[in-house]
Amino acid sequence: VKVNKIQTEENKDKTLRQDAESCILADCSLCPRNCHVDRTAGKTGYCGMNQKVKIARAALHMWEEPCISGTRGSGAVFFTGCNLRCCFCQNREIAIGDSGLEITEERLAEIFLELQEKDAANINLVTGTHYIPQIIAALDCAKKHGLNIPVVYNCGGYENTETLKLLDGYVDIYLPDYKYAESELAVKFSHANDYPERAMEAVNEMVRQTGMPQFDAEGYMKRGTIVRHLILPGHTRNSKKVLKLLHKTFGKQIYISIMNQYTPVFEQKEYTELNRCVTRREYEKVLDYAFELGIENGFFQDGETARAVSYTHLRAHE
């Protein structure tokens, strides 16, 4: 009788959860695109995804910042689809929805637990904005079955603050991009003219939730916000503006990860300045500016491509 009662309660919870999820996805405004399409009816908005969860990869990932991957690896789940259309995207097939496998929320919960069993330092949700209701459901299920490692929300920064509030209490670490301080570049390269404003609002909400960065004895982040910025060739001015804005607004409340891993994966016909890597001079110019600002909490990269990089704490560069 006790087992039946538990099962009945779980079924009730699942029904209520599914009703709430359907209500959100039936008029989708999870991200700033505010498409208002009915994804429960199989329709898709800007992200290209309907209600069914689709993932491209789930595995231990060793290429994040040291406090995220460490030596154990981050339990990364790469979700298919994206609310940005960056012309330089290195994961284009995943972003436009051509790659991946449809799974249930229950299977997603199992994947979280399997990654924990592999000794993942955390669960790393990569580009999951358009699946937040389903992710929350999967996390609820996984936590009931023993999930207890930190959860990382890894995103492009183009977020709706009201949607982020749904993640309060579920996400321990936020890992957003802050790509552009200049809206002109946001329009050109990612088709999102309001990116600077939305990304700043998003980081504010993330910091509100996580508070000051916290680390365990092994150096893994337990709680906090790391903001990433990828330097683009020919656009160091934008990078300087980003660093100044982030440091002035948040100071030591966040870590800033300055990345030089931009790699042209296909030839740009319209934006030819993107057909090369960032030069050493460009990268050092941005790093020097970071030190001029007094940024200490952060990381920079050694290496010149997305695959050949390692992270170093900013203080080690002095």
At which residue positions do the language-model features occur?
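Conserved small/polar residues in nucleotide/adenosyl-binding loops
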Residues: 312-318
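Active-site beta-loop-alpha junctions enriched in small/polar residues
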Residues: 128-130, 156-158, 230-232, 259-263, ...
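Flexible, acidic/Gly-rich N-terminal and inter-domain linker regions that tether
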Residues: 1-74, 84
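Non-cysteine beta-strand/loop elements that form the S-adenosyl-L-methionine
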Residues: 171-182, 255-261
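Short glycine-enriched, charge-decorated loop/helix-capping segments at active-site entrances
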Residues: 93-99, 188-193, 270-277
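Generic structural signal for well-ordered alpha-helices
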Residues: 112, 136-139, 164, 203, ...
